């Protein structure tokens, strides 16, 4: 009987700790800021996958259930494309390099297993001008584990953004959490 109680406690305590940390984050009236890096590849295309890299930041707006998100992303055809499709020529001009600024204002914050998500409509630029894929639905999922409560981020674009970034989540890392 004691071993069943111990096993039950061993299973429930980590869940309660994670729920408590998320609850404390959600109930704190101060704004919480998270930031990190996206480091991903788009799905395979006829020209090859794109490398997608850049910094992001997210601000949880206290108890409002809202958040603001921004990312500055660089995209270029991958090294794999250079080796298989471009005869090993690493000329940056041939790699289709471009930038995107992604902004989501007043996104809705909801709890998910192991963290939270922010969803809403994002504005997207390409090389500083409006992108034809803007506006697009965007879901940002921030998760973690028992040692690091918020360690991972994943960005998933809806159409028309998914036509450019792909339908799979773009992974990244949480580097900093500030309260």
Cite the ranges covered by each PLM segment:
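A short, surface-exposed beta-strand/turn
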Residues: 131-154
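Edge beta-strand at a domain terminus
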Residues: 85-105, 154-179
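Bacterial N-terminal signal peptides
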Residues: 11-21
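Predominantly extracellular/secreted and cell-surface proteins with exposed
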Residues: 49-136
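Short acidic, glycine-rich loop/turn motifs
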Residues: 40-44, 122-130, 159
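N-terminal segment immediately downstream of the Sec signal-peptide cleavage site
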Residues: 26-77, 163-179
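Bacterial N-terminal signal peptides that target proteins for export
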Residues: 2-12
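N-terminal helix-cap/turn-to-beta initiation motif at the start of protein domains
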Residues: 25-31, 110-115
């Amino acid at each position: 009987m004691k071993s069943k109680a111990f096993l039950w406690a061993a299973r429930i305590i980590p869940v309660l700790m994670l729920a408590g940390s998320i609850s404390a984050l959600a109930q704190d009236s101060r704004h919480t800021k998270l930031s990190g890096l996206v480091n991903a590849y788009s799905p395979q295309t006829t020209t090859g996958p794109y490398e997608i890299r850049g910094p992001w930041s997210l601000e949880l707006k206290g108890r409002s259930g809202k958040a603001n998100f921004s990312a500055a992303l660089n995209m270029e055809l991958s090294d794999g494309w250079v080796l298989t499709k471009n005869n090993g020529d690493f000329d940056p001009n041939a790699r289709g390099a471009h930038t995107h600024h992604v902004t989501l204002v007043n996104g809705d914050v909801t709890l998910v297993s192991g963290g939270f998500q922010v969803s809403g409509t994002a504005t997207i630029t390409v090389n500083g001008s409006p992108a034809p894929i803007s506006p697009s639905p965007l879901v940002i999922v921030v998760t973690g584990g028992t040692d690091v409560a918020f360690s991972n981020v994943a960005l998933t674009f809806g159409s028309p953004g998914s036509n450019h970034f792909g339908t799979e989540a773009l992974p990244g890392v949480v580097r900093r959490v500030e309260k």
